[in-house]
């Protein structure tokens, strides 16, 4: 768990979890993620994108409320980079996450042309006030960065959001769940995704 990497990661995740619930509708956000996974999106990459977007949207809001948060965030980011640096370099989403953390620590914007546009999108998310803005951002990131064929093959955001609860409840989520769920598997999966959103360590 993140606690064994650094207490600051765990503390920052806990602070952010409370903020995410206060400022945004975490269940609605997780439901969007669930629908996207149902339609074939890569869960791991989608979760990483969700975490980055939630981080971008929450951190300024928390810092204004609690003066000690920027220092905790800095220590958490340093610990994540120490522990997960190589792992983050393995994926495009990991590289964007790394660029975002580096800028937070050093004040330097990324020089890599492949991450400049997503990085700029993330900076804009810092002003986000609505859950819909997070949903739109993650969907844009996924379709641009992870699977540029998704929209053409499966459909746009409207198509994703139109997935019904009947469709979700009829799907076998066991392979995605961290523990067995005899019933209401899709609800458990939704809660699992919601809880994962405020964890920033890889």
State each model region's role.
Residues 1-202:
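Short, functionally important secondary-structure microenvironments
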